[in-house]
Regions:
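A compositional/biophysical signature of low hydrophobicity enriched in polar/charged and small residues
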Residues: 1-364
Length: 364
């Protein structure tokens, strides 16, 4: 049943919606009529798929349908960043941090390091990652700011189980291979033209790639062929739906961090990544004020379910001492967008930073 309130559609997904969402998170086929293709898999016609998707987008359950690119494979440098602020300064600091076009995720979390964001800079950045972070730290008056780049990627696979059939402690049946990060070849000018189109939100119409192809000055098969090549080269992980976790019913977002001895990292990292509730698993650097080396992101429908999944990981790995782990929950979302590549915003931000001008703020 759907109702409207305050101009926003409220929609409770039914079983068919949930099956569709699972399929779309796994990936949309790179074919001329992708909605008809996914409908055929689910016993729906194209019109029904488009209607359901329209409602799910109006209800903000589906954020967008687009290519999911690998930042590093495209030549960008990126990192998770942790920052510490007094509570009274946090929101203004978050607006300044969010004004950088390479900040796609920006959250308040339950820790002394209370602002967590992801930062990416272009391949030809004049500042680079470290100096960009330092400019943000100075502009926001951070008490501390730590760069936490990926040292080892064990897993990245954000696919929420919309059907509810998956137990909180479920594990992969076979070890998932470590993700590849591109082929080391920089995108060409033609590649960038295709990427600029594929990173948009896919229109809800029978042949959506045709419209994009016309905008790029190519035919639809050329665009789709380029997209398939990007997948083969690991530029693109998949073309898929990105959900609003909370609106999809996953209200708990716990970042579980673990103190793991150096000689156990390569054993325990993959074992943590095997849990289906874990969407991301990374090894990151430690600091005197940050001793945790492995990060696991857990999404669940409730905090209790999140804690159950984390307890199962602790039991599996033997890290049962509470002093060797922490769970940081997201309590406020300042910014969450799909990162846009090869756009002028990065250079414009650096122009301001290098000139010593005031930095832009997210939300104006």
């Amino acid at each position: 049943m759907t109702t409207t309130a305050a101009g926003r559609l409220h929609h409770k997904p039914d079983e068919a919606d949930r099956e569709l969402l699972n399929q779309l998170q796994a990936g949309l086929a790179l074919v001329r009529e992708p909605y008809a293709e996914v409908g055929a898999r689910l016993g729906m016609d194209e019109e029904e798929v488009l209607g359901r998707l329209a409602r799910l987008k109006q209800a903000a359950i589906v954020r967008q349908l687009s290519a999911i690119f690998d930042t590093r494979a495209l030549g960008y440098t990126s990192s998770l960043v942790a920052a510490r602020y007094p509570d009274e300064r946090l929101f203004e600091a978050a607006r300044i941090v969010g004004g950088h076009p390479g900040v796609s995720h920006n959250y308040r979390r339950t820790h002394a390091f209370n602002l967590w964001y992801t930062l990416a800079v272009e391949p030809d950045s004049r500042l680079g990652l470290q100096a960009t972070m330092e400019r943000l730290a100075a502009a926001t008056g951070a008490e501390s700011m730590r760069l936490l780049p990926t040292l080892k990627l064990y897993k990245i696979n954000v696919q929420l189980d919309m059907t509810g059939a998956q137990p909180t402690d479920a594990k992969e049946e076979a070890p998932r291979p470590a993700p590849t990060r591109g082929d080391g070849v920089a995108p060409t000018a033609d590649d960038k033209r295709m990427i600029a189109v594929l990173q948009r939100d896919l229109p809800l119409e029978p042949r959506p790639f045709d419209r994009w192809a016309a905008a790029a000055g190519v035919d639809a098969e050329q665009l789709l062929s380029a997209a398939r090549v990007f997948v083969a080269r690991s530029y693109m992980r998949r073309f898929a739906a990105v959900l609003n976790h909370r609106r999809a019913g996953f209200g708990a977002n716990g970042m579980a961090v673990w103190r793991v001895p150096e000689d156990e990292l390569e054993e325990l990292g993959p074992r943590m990544a095997a849990f289906k509730a874990v969407s991301h698993c990374y090894r990151r650097p430690t600091y005197p004020d940050w001793p945790y080396s492995i990060f696991t992101m857990v999404h669940a429908r409730s905090k209790d379910a999140c804690e159950q999944a984390i307890a199962a990981i602790a039991e599996e790995t033997g890290i049962t001492d509470p002093g060797r782990r922490a769970v940081l929950y997201s309590t406020y979302e300042f910014k969450k967008i799909r990162l846009m590549y090869f756009t002028p915003g990065y250079r414009e931000w650096e122009d301001l930073a290098l000139a010593g001008a005031p930095l832009p703020r997210w939300g104006g």
